[in-house]
Amino acid sequence: MFALPVLALALAGCEREPESRGESASTERTRPNILLIVADDLGYSDIGPFGGEIATPTLDQLAKEGLQLTNFHVLPSCSPTRSVLLSGMDNHRAGLGTMGELKTPEMEGHPGYAGYLNFEVAALPEVLRAGGYHTYMTGKWHLGHSEETIPHARGFEETFILVPGGGSHWSDLKPVSPTQTMMYRRNGKVVEALPEDFYSTRYYTDTMLQFIERNHEDGKPFFAYLSYTAPHDPLHAPREYIDKYKGKYNEGWDVLRAVRLQRLKDLGIIGKDVEPFPRLASVKAWDDMSDDERLNAARDMEVYAAMVDYMDEQIKRVFDYLKEIGEYDNTMIIFISDNGANGALPTAYPGQTDEYLRSFDNSLDNRGLPNSYVETGPGWAQASMSPSRMFKAFTAEGGIKAPFLVKPPGRLADGGTMNHSLFHVRDIMPTILDLAGINHSEEFNGRKVRPMQGRSVLGLFEGKVKLPYKEASQVGYELFGLKAFFDGDWKILWMPPPFGPGDWELFNLKQDPGEVADLSAQHPEKLKEMVGLWEQYKADNGVLDISLDLSDKVK
């Protein structure tokens, strides 16, 4: 199935022109386009196909046309997931054993902890471009900020990107903390100022449409990486979209979580008897909050919903354009979130100060508008991740379980179906290359590169098989010293107090996706077996014994 080799040093740049433009067009048009859409900190149950009440008609329709994977897993935070997504290998091999902002002296000298997408991997856009694809990116990068590590240097030919992990969604260029820099780049060059009417989600979409339009008549297929920063904090949305959800969340996070839990059961995504992980002790019951606390919290969730709603509308613009130019049916479309919903507070960001946070106008009427800085917090994050334990940053299910929708080129005979098999982000790149007919070589651009650990599941995406390859059911995790390992329906989890017991726990996720009942005492041999598998994972991937104290990041 792999037809085109990735050319080594002489042809790695893929600048060679075809002998005949007409011949190229007729040949290349048979090759599918790839549209990869990533939402930022979107919760598992936020969108309609996964039980959400937020208006997402575009994604609802995508689920009806394609395949919905209900057991898809990513990494606990942004850049580690993106490193796996664009490399097909474990984050420790790809350079994001930790986030760049959280790198410690002990990690220096270890390529797996470089803090950027390292050069031991051939990145997905590099491989696709060498194989004859246009490669476009708009939105969040977060995989390196130097001239050598930005996307324009890693295979993308046209880019408009946010370099760091987050910041204001408006034109004011305000970072998430005063020690960080809000930077955009266009085709590698720093953008000094944004248009006054800039709003991130719209601008990323506008720019991506310009990129696709510019070359669509040349006959070459394209890879478009649309990497939205919605709904990452600070939460910002146009007022009319916020107003659309006014009063929607006045009953609070406990009610919302229960409603979404029931919808997940009704949709057949989880079993009828599933119990959710309890509300965190640090999260107030809604009825115990003051009137002002409830008003502010409800407004914050209204803004969050508005961001997701607006993103869905912008995705529709892309789909409509692809239909207009006759490319929709020839495009594989993948939609994911990069991690679980964010339950951390703004104080979690490195370099944060009270003085900086006080500089914003977070009055009720201005929340979500320019010069505000609000977040959902752990209460709403638990609702967004119903029925899971914890949220972003944790190796519990709430940090690593994400929505996944895919529409292969053409039409699925049984579109609108669900698949409950364990599927991991490491398998996306191999699947895309399989679809494109491109080999992954052991040498790229004059350097030796590691082979991908993930494998193609194209047959699953195309509805030809019901299960991915056998080894797909075994996946290891480590980030910030938090650990996990999957073996089919079984999972072991290690988290320190106060988030866990500081020892391994064992869960059967098919019966208990909320990770409520630790079965380690009942199944000691299974626990021992899986701890051994995790130790092998650690050795194979160069995992260091370094932990990060998260106790002051989540209250």
Predicted regions: what they are:
Residues 11-13:
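C-terminal motif of bacterial Sec signal peptides marking the signal peptidase cleavage site
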